[in-house]
Regions:
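Short, Lys/Arg-enriched N-terminal segments with co-localized hydrophobic residues
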Residues: 3-18
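Short, flexible coil/linker segments at domain boundaries that flank nucleotide/cofactor-interacting
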Residues: 16-18, 62, 95
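N-terminal beta1-alpha1 ligand-phosphate binding loop
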Residues: 20-46
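Cofactor-binding loop segments of dinucleotide-utilizing enzymes, especially the Rossmann-like FAD-
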Residues: 26, 54, 103-105
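Residues that form or flank phosphate/diphosphate-binding pockets in enzymes
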Residues: 30-34, 60, 78
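FMN-binding flavodoxin-like domain, especially the glycine-rich phosphate-binding loop
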Residues: 42, 46-50, 64-178
Length: 178
């Protein structure tokens, strides 16, 4: 039953408490947003899920939270400034007791191989998901799966065929890891 509030902390359905999950993302061309929505929908079978763009965070989104997933496009081998600021803004041990996971969107291996210097820098600096995961762990979160990357065609996308299905499968793996 909806009591008119947009941010329910827990629901009780048939005597069982539904766990709360939050998917926070930033997106430049819409690809990361689409992956975040797919992940949120897939988690909906086991969680009460909110999917929010990093700049639209609600007050106290972590109250009652059991799972936090953060995603960003890879820009200059890092998460976006918005995601970096979000991670910095979290209090020390602010994610203690919360399961966490991280993902990014990135160029395909084929696109990277076409530019030798890009291949070199990717080998050195990597992608956005790993720094996101490290930031979540530094704030006390418990990483449930290794960081994941989803592929886009070229700099702006679209997503490579099959990435929505991979995102759904990754979300199912997160549920199974609980």
């Amino acid at each position: 039953m909806d009591d008119g509030t947009s941010n329910k902390i827990d629901m009780v359905a048939g005597g069982t408490t539904i766990m709360k999950a939050l998917v926070v993302y930033d997106s430049k061309f819409g690809n990361t947003e689409r992956i975040a929505q797919v992940i949120g929908n897939a988690l909906g079978s086991s969680y009460e899920v909110e999917v929010l763009q990093v700049g639209t965070m609600v007050p106290d989104p972590f109250e009652g939270l059991e799972l936090l997933i953060v995603g960003s496009p890879t820009q200059q081998f890092n998460p976006t400034k918005g995601i970096k600021n979000f991670l910095k803004s979290l209090p020390s041990n602010g994610l203690k007791g919360i399961k966490v996971a991280a993902f990014d969107t990135r160029l395909t291996i084929e696109d990277i191989k076409e530019v030798a210097i890009l291949s070199f820098f990717v080998r050195i600096f990597g992608y956005a998901a790993k720094p996101i995961a490290n930031g979540l762990k530094r704030k006390g979160g418990e990483l449930v799966l290794p960081p994941e990357g989803f592929y886009v065609q070229g700099m702006e996308g679209p997503l490579v065929e099959g990435e929505f299905e991979r995102a759904e499968e990754w979300a199912r793996q997160i549920i199974a890891a609980q």
